[in-house]
A protein has these predicted regions:
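C-terminal helical/coil "lid" or tail adjacent to the Rossmann-like core of SAM-dependent
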Residues: 4-16, 198-251
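Conserved alpha-helix/loop element of class I SAM-dependent methyltransferases that forms part
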Residues: 23-40, 57
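Conserved class I S-adenosyl-L-methionine
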Residues: 41-50
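Class I SAM-dependent methyltransferase SAM/SAH-binding core
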Residues: 53-101
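Helix-to-beta-strand junctions that scaffold the AdoMet/dcAdoMet cofactor pocket
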Residues: 63, 121-122, 135-136
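A short SAM/SAH-binding and catalytic strip from SAM-dependent methyltransferases
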Residues: 110-124
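A short glycine-rich, Lys/Arg-flanked "PGG" loop and its adjoining helix->strand segment in the class I
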Residues: 125-139
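Conserved catalytic/acceptor-binding region of the Class I
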Residues: 141-209
């Protein structure tokens, strides 16, 4: 079975999955990192930093006087992040915390990164309000993918609808994470204690022929989908994949909510 869980059992958090995802989106993520650099932070805290990929990217862009703190609950991921950071010439540290249970222990910073972590937080309203009360002067930078917008094709509409329905039935009520969390996130951000809310929707799109940096993420997404849908739908999806094994007539897109709050 294709595994995308980390050592703590969190879905879509396996180190290999995260690396493939990151490499696929380097252009978009680099552009956002440069936007954050224009805010001239002196300290950045990355909530759910996992293996440190975002901090590694920011390390190439931020001035060396900007301190980094990475926080995650998974010790294996933190060990990879620590190893990744050893060559950095800046003050860097990592903390093992459950960010929802230990929100009051989150250090203050000029920018708090919350990238695709909200699906793992049960009471998002309480988390945001506690975070704002604890760190009232910093900027909260949010990036949240929308599981409902992930689309690959071209594909017959009936087949697509069946696959999407199967996937929702399988994971829509998962107790491990919320794959369809963009609307809950948007509502929670809007009614939080943050006063300023700058938001946009970022389109990630690729059309064939695909760049080789994108292919592992694309194929991983299809394999992950196959293992959650019904056997009948998985057979159809596998047949569809085999009809174009060289990826000459394919597209992929998804949408992320991107927000800066203060």
């Amino acid at each position: 079975m294709y595994s995308e869980e980390n050592s703590s059992g969190k879905p879509l958090a396996n180190p290999d999955w995260l690396l493939n995802h990151h490499r696929a989106k380097i252009p978009e993520r680099t552009a956002f990192a440069k936007k954050l650099a224009k805010l001239h932070p002196k300290k950045i805290v990355d909530l759910g930093c996992a293996t440190g990929l975002w901090l590694e990217l920011l390390n190439e862009i931020m001035p060396l006087d900007c301190e980094f703190i990475g926080i995650d609950s998974d010790i294996q991921s933190l060990e990879i992040a620590i190893s990744r950071s050893r060559s950095w010439s800046r003050k860097t540290s990592f903390l093992q915390l459950d960010i929802e249970k230990d929100v009051i222990s989150i250090p203050s910073a000029d920018i708090i990164l919350a990238f695709n972590i909200f699906p793992y937080i049960k009471d998002l309203d309480a988390f945001l309000n506690t975070l704002n009360a604890k760190i009232p002067s910093g900027i909260l930078a949010v990036r949240q993918y929308d599981g409902a917008s992930i689309r690959f094709g071209p594909m017959a509409t009936a087949m697509r609808q069946k696959i999407e329905q199967d996937l929702y039935i399988a994971i829509g009520n998962s107790e491990k994470f919320r794959h369809y969390d963009l609307d809950r996130t948007f509502i929670a951000l809007k009614r939080s204690a943050y006063k300023k809310f700058e938001y946009s929707f970022e389109l990630f799109e690729r059309t064939s022929p695909f760049d080789q940096e994108f292919v592992p993420y694309y194929e991983g997404t299809l394999l992950w989908t196959c293992q959650h849908i019904s056997d009948t739908s998985a057979e159809l999806l596998n047949k569809w994949m085999n009809e174009d094994v060289h990826l000459q007539n394919r597209y992929f897109y998804e949408v992320d909510l991107v927000a800066l709050l203060s």
